[in-house]
A protein has these predicted regions:
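A short SAM/SAH-binding and catalytic strip from SAM-dependent methyltransferases
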Residues: 35-49
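A short acidic, Gly/Pro-enriched loop at the edge of an enzyme's catalytic core
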Residues: 25-37
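Class I SAM-dependent methyltransferase SAM/SAH-binding core
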Residues: 1-26
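Surface-exposed loop/turn positions
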Residues: 33, 66-67
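C-terminal alpha-helical "lid/dimerization" subdomain adjacent to the S-adenosyl-L-methionine
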Residues: 52, 67-111, 115-128
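C-terminal lobe and adjacent flexible extensions of AdoMet/dcAdoMet transferase-like proteins
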Residues: 129-135
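A short glycine-rich, Lys/Arg-flanked "PGG" loop and its adjoining helix->strand segment in the class I
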Residues: 52-64
Length: 135
């Protein structure tokens, strides 16, 4: 099901929910309107400049003390390095490869997030990062 189709389906099943569409880089939502934001295997789809805009938007949308939780690609350990490279070559774009070269926790700190914590998963091929908007 395409994203718009999924949104239509959700609207039919839950007519009381408000539907908001926009770009992750500049969402049409109020500042400090969320206590938590989750980004799951999405950031690697954005070029670096747009990825920074997405993260700045997340910081803007979080209320003070609010949490960002994200899961995305990380350079794999020795056993999964070749499979990860093959997967990226066959199924991903250059943006995924670029993300594997970057230090996402440091990027989050430079953007103004605090309490940044990283956990490596799946043979180091994925990372789960939590961070907060300072109070």
């Amino acid at each position: 099901m395409s994203p718009p189709g999924a949104l239509d389906f959700a609207a039919q099943r839950h007519p009381s929910l408000k539907r908001v569409e926009g770009l992750a880089e500049d969402p049409p939502l109020a500042d400090a309107s969320f206590s938590a934001i989750q980004l799951s295997v999405a950031l690697h789809e954005f070029p670096r400049s747009d990825r920074e805009r997405v993260l700045r938007s997340a910081l803007r949308l979080l209320e003070p003390g609010g949490w960002l939780v994200l899961v995305d690609l990380h350079p794999a350990g020795p056993w999964l390095k070749l499979p990860q490279q093959l997967f990226c070559a066959l199924f991903e774009t250059d943006t995924a490869t670029a993300m594997l070269e970057d230090d996402l926790p440091t990027e989050l700190e430079q953007l103004g997030f605090s309490s940044v914590s990283q956990e490596l998963l799946a043979g180091r091929a994925l990372q789960r990062i939590t961070a907060t908007r300072p109070r």
